[in-house]
Amino acid sequence: MYLMRKIVFVSCVILGLAACSSQPEQIGGGVYDMKTVQEYNARVISGNTVTQTQKDKITQQIDTSLKLNQSDNKVKTRTRRVLPVLPVTPSVGYHYNYHYFR
């Protein structure tokens, strides 16, 4: 029993040391063109990330004068519903909490 515990403990220590000492994998370490990266960073810092052709394309797609419904030309009047005001008053009646006293 003691020998089994010792073997399990030693193997756990060895596996732990092997896992901690191994180098992590480098994921996504691609090769970047540094000139392009510097141009992009300059555009981000200046706030000019959208080109003028992209801006023109978007403004052509959005037409604010387009009416989606024929009813958009009509004058709309809204009526307000007035709910009656009911006074809330405390009251004590004959059957007040009667189910607790059975």
Swiss-Prot record:
Superkingdom: Bacteria
Entry's transmembrane regions: 7-23
Keyword field contains Transmembrane helix: yes
Membrane topology term: Single-pass membrane protein
Keyword entries, A-Z: Membrane, Transmembrane, Transmembrane helix
Predominant cellular place of this UniProt entry's protein: membrane
Subcellular location as annotated: Membrane
A GO term from the CC aspect: membrane
UniProt-recorded name of the protein: Uncharacterized protein HI_1099
